């Protein structure tokens, strides 16, 4: 039976304290007990439904965590204060000094910096690889390899990982496969493809209004409980705790995620095809020319399409900057990082979201100075948007 993540979200039923249709927001950092013994039992983990301190958990955070676990079809989830809060906690929970990680050569700049610069200082080895090359992944496996870390669709080059095949490699070698699914919520369900842990930056599509920073870790109940353990849990001890007000806001926005993802994807596919037709070098997983188009099709929940991210290459950084500035001036969208907003966002990743990656490594992986990354918005008239963008390209002699 086909998995329908939007149905899982629709079927959530949380009541407010006084019968409200939205669950009540717990606006407290600490909680009272009727007896000292109840407090002791709660600290020991022997009671259900009791709260101690909001760094441990709060009702609002548990509501959102439950919703995200349903969406990703995992046993449990835990929300964090940012996407990086989720990524760092997972890797530090799974790995220790002397362990080894295999990861994609093209990943979000903050993740790259953590893996490249931070973890080696704590005695962990990291190898970066073309994540689409399964033989290369296998060749890098060592006896101490504990994690294969990847993004479903890589940032910013939009390389598509074969999550099912990589998960099989992980299981064969007793290696945990961790997937950042930020670019493809609803569209791809990594846990159904064998991934052990699924991460999102909630800041992006899931929240969708660029007014909140947050993250989530989805996995087995045992793993989530380990992360929240008061003695050695990375989420508990690192303290990347989401505010209850923000949890409540994101939970409400999740109710429209299925509508938004369909529109983001439809608009992006239209623009990708239109850019192709006028001779602009375009990368989008929904184009048949994308080297991993068929792999994406084999993984996706097709009603949500191929996502809202695409790139074009205009040749040089100077041209890229000029195009973006003119697009902002003509109200195509905003010259800004991040993604998943209702307006189109665009940036030159080599000097922004991937600037942590050294220039020589950017060149080696194919991240050119002229690359513009688009997060396509919810525009009602995407043909009008294309004409605006085309006018910018024409006026700057890009086409």
Residue ranges and their predicted role:
Residues 1-58, 66, 372:
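N-terminal "arm"/small-domain region of PLP-dependent enzymes with the aminotransferase-like
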Residues 35-85, 110-117:
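Conserved N-terminal alpha-helix of the aminotransferase class I/II PLP-enzyme fold
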Residues 116, 125, 139, 146, ...:
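PLP-dependent enzyme catalytic core of the Aspartate aminotransferase-like
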Residues 40-47, 325-327, 389-391:
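Short Gly/aromatic-enriched secondary-structure transition segments
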Residues 235, 327-339, 391-399:
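A common structural junction motif
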Residues 269-343, 357-363:
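Conserved small-domain helix->loop->beta segment predominantly found in fold-type I
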Residues 6-14, 76-283, 297:
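Conserved PLP-enzyme active-site core in the AAT-like
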Residues 250-259, 307-315, 373-377:
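Short, well-ordered beta-strand elements within core beta-sheets of diverse protein domains
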């Amino acid at each position: 039976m086909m998995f329908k993540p939007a149905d899982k979200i629709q079927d959530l039923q949380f009541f407010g304290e006084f019968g409200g249709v939205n669950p009540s927001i717990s606006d407290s950092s600490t909680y009272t007990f009727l007896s000292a013994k109840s407090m002791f039992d709660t600290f020991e983990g022997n009671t259900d439904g009791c709260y101690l301190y909001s760094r441990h958990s709060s009702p609002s955070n548990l509501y959102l965590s439950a919703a995200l676990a349903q969406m990703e079809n995992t046993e449990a989830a835990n929300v964090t204060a940012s996407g990086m809060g989720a990524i760092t906690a997972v890797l530090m929970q799974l790995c220790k000094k002397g362990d080894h990680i295999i990861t994609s050569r093209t990943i979000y700049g903050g993740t790259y910096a953590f893996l490249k610069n931070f973890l080696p200082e704590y005695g962990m080895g990291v190898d970066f690889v073309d994540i689409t090359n399964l033989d290369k992944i296998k060749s890098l496996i060592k006896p101490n390899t504990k994690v294969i870390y990847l993004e479903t669709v890589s940032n910013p080059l939009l390389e598509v990982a074969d999550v099912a095949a990589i998960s099989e490699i992980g299981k064969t070698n007793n290696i945990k496969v961790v997937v950042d699914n930020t670019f493809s919520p609803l569209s791809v369900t990594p846990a159904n493809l064998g991934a052990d842990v699924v991460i999102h930056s909630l800041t992006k599509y899931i929240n969708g209004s660029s007014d909140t920073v947050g993250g989530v870790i989805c996995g087995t109940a045992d793993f989530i409980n380990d992360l929240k353990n008061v003695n050695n849990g990375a989420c508990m001890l690192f303290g990347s705790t989401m505010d209850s007000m923000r949890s409540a806001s994101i939970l409400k926005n999740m109710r429209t995620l299925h509508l938004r993802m369909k529109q983001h994807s439809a608009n992006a596919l239209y623009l990708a095809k239109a850019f192709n037709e006028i001779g602009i070098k375009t990368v989008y997983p929904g184009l048949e020319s994308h080297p991993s188009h068929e792999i994406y099709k084999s993984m996706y929940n097709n009603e949500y399409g191929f996502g809202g991210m695409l790139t074009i290459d205009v040749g040089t950084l100077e041209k890229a900057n000029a195009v973006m500035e003119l697009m902002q001036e003509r109200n195509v969208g905003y010259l800004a990082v991040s993604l998943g907003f209702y307006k189109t966002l665009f940036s030159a990743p080599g000097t922004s979201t991937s600037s942590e990656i050294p220039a020589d490594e950017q060149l080696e992986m194919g991240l050119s100075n002229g690359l513009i990354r688009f997060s396509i918005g919810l525009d009602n008239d995407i043909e009008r948007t294309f004409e605006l963008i085309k006018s910018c390209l024409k006026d700057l002699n890009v086409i």
